[in-house]
């Protein structure tokens, strides 16, 4: 309830949307990745009777996560839960417009037993806090959701260190309208 209230106050969304869409999604995301954590296994492939090929999945290390403002709780969970399941620590920069929900999620994770220092929140503006995360040599991967412009900047800035980078950029919502479509009803 506190988390939904914080989200509504930060985003201006109705409490019902914060509760059902965002908080419901957060709960489902953490539940899913809690189960997934037990299924991250390496593989063994028999090449021939004298040769095996083994893979071992290991955490990537420290993940820098930069979040947008539009779905702050849900998108925070989409970054935090998989990183926890994979055994990674993280430095998270929430949007400067909606930092409180992410801070509250981190607090709840700590109360649930996640050790201190696993989830680290770095509030601030992107040009300062985000840039510090991207340029930090001890951060092994960057996960960013936001604009294409900033995504390009992150990709360039991280190329010197060859960090792994995941970008979710500038969502699109295309529509296909056929000749017989009533355009007025589509608007």
Task: Explain the meaning of each model-derived region.
Residues 7, 30, 87, 119, ...:
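Residue-level signal for inorganic ion chemistry
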Residues 80-81, 130, 151, 187:
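Generic hydrophobic/aromatic pocket-lining and core-packing "Φ" positions
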